[in-house]
Amino acid sequence: MSKNYIAEGAVVKGKVQMGEDVSIWYNATVRGDSAEIKIGDRTNVQDNAVIHVDTHYPTTIGNGVTIGHGAIVHGCTVGDNTLIGMGAIVLNGASIGENCIIGAGAL
């Protein structure tokens, strides 16, 4: 049984698939309007983060991922057990492997 949590003020719109035990925190935006977003099990999208897509760039996020406060993940792939640091920006076509750390504020 899925126990996903979507905090007050968070927005999840469009073509979004979520695994189990996913948490989307305050004022985060997950917007799959022009392509699909897939979010794996036990992934944590922290406050004010944005997950978005572009027409030819869906977004796929693995299992056990943390997307830090204010990070932007746009049209890319993020592998399992990866941390996207606070305020980091990951752009169209990027592919981040498993067990990686993207530092806070990185582009």
Regions found by a protein language model. Give the residues of each.
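Left-handed beta-helix
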Residues: S2, A7-E8, K13-G14, G19-E20, ...
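Phosphate/pyrophosphate-binding betaalpha-module
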Residues: E36
